[in-house]
């Protein structure tokens, strides 16, 4: 990928594949697992690249904020941002993991139907142009609001706990719809 192609690219996954190739990092999509924990002594990701990736994932969460209506998920994003800035210990990130994971499970298993229906109605009411701005351009049809809500919740968990995941690779396919090439360019510069 040339710098001009990087600047014009609308596919964050293609861009990430290029970066991973340049850094000689396996770019296989990771499987989103649960139960990750950071070591209590760690206060920052292992590398500048991991820090950049974590910030990018959290920025994506902010971009899709209307798709993340659960308070615990929003708190988790805020804690992860503070963790990256060195303002809270790893234990704080580990503590919020349980609640963020639980929020995603609650949506997935429809454990609070009234609340879930309110959230779905809120997403249904998002104007088409606003929703399009949150999603990858390849998605031409409006996604099902429940599926979007569920995927966004699981993506937020992935984004928050990204530093604890090993191995790291491309996000799982179901999260690609949220990744923004423009936002990636804000966090990562072209490097040949």
Describe the role of every protein-language-model region:
Residues 1-192:
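Structured binding/interaction patches within domain cores
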């Amino acid at each position: 990928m040339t710098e001009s192609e990087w600047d014009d690219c609308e596919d964050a996954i293609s861009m990430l594949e290029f970066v991973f190739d340049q850094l000689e990092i396996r770019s296989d999509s990771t499987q989103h697992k649960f139960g990750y924990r950071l070591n209590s002594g760690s206060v920052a990701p292992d590398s500048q690249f991991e820090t950049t990736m974590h910030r990018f994932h959290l920025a994506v969460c902010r971009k899709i904020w209307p798709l993340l209506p659960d308070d615990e998920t929003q708190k988790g994003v805020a804690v992860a941002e503070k963790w990256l800035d060195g303002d809270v210990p790893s234990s704080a990130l580990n503590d919020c993991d349980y609640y963020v994971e639980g929020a995603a499970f609650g949506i997935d298993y429809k454990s609070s139907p009234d609340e879930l229906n309110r959230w779905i109605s809120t997403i249904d009411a998002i104007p088409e142009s606003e929703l399009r701005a949150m999603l990858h351009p390849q998605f031409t049809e409006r996604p099902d609001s429940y599926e979007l809500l569920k995927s966004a919740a699981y993506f937020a968990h992935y984004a928050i706990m990204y530093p604890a995941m090993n191995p790291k690779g491309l996000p799982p396919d179901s999260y690609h719809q949220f990744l923004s090439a423009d936002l990636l360019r804000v966090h990562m510069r072209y490097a040949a």
